[in-house]
Amino acid sequence: MSEINIILVRHGEASASWSEDPDPGLSKDGINQAKKLCEDESLKNLHNFKFISSPRKRAQETSSFLSSKLNKVLEINNVFDEIPAKGVLLEDKMDWLKSIASMPIKDLPISVQEWNKKIIDTILSINQDSIIFTHFMVMNAVVAYAKQFSKLVNISPDYTSTIKITAKDSQIISLKVGDQKKTKINI
């Protein structure tokens, strides 16, 4: 099997925090960040790439300028949605997320372990060059798997930063993490 290129893109800055709105769109800064993806030299040759997004507004809105420029249809894939926090109240989500971040992967709640496994299984089964617009924790799940880290959170991807993956024979053979920065959603 030939090499498959996969690019993960973190969404732009959201108009509200995770604890304030379960599905915010992009802020004005987030819209500008998404527009700048069209000028990113490393994202120029995406004509043969499949465009995939989390179902969340901020991920879809982040993809919109680049997908429009390249006349791409966006596929929504629930696997790349944010970390599941079923039963966690909005006002408690940040504290919950901090506890998840410091927990060994093997001790994560079953729903989070299943979410993590689906992400990895899906990444390893992609058979076409793809760009995926997604979330902080999804990107961390992929890095933790590829680098065999014991905890889920190991990087702080900036808004609209990328992780470039090369996969072959259902294995990640290279991974390059883009810009990192502490953002208001990061822990």
Task: Annotate each predicted stretch with a short phrase.
Residues 2-76, 99, 103, 160:
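Active-site-proximal alpha-helix that buttresses catalytic centers in soluble enzyme cores
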Residues 6, 49, 126-137:
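Generic beta-sheet signal
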Residues 11, 135, 181-184:
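Histidine-centered active-site/metal-ligand motif
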Residues 14, 138-139:
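Short active-site segment of divalent metal-dependent hydrolases/proteases
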Residues 24-25, 67-120, 176, 187:
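Phosphate-handling substructures
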Residues 54-56, 79, 133-137:
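Short, well-ordered beta-to-alpha junction loops that form the rim of enzyme active sites
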Residues 65, 141, 145:
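Active-site signature of alpha/beta-hydrolase-fold catalytic machinery across serine-
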Residues 149-177:
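Domain-level recognition of soluble alpha/beta enzyme cores
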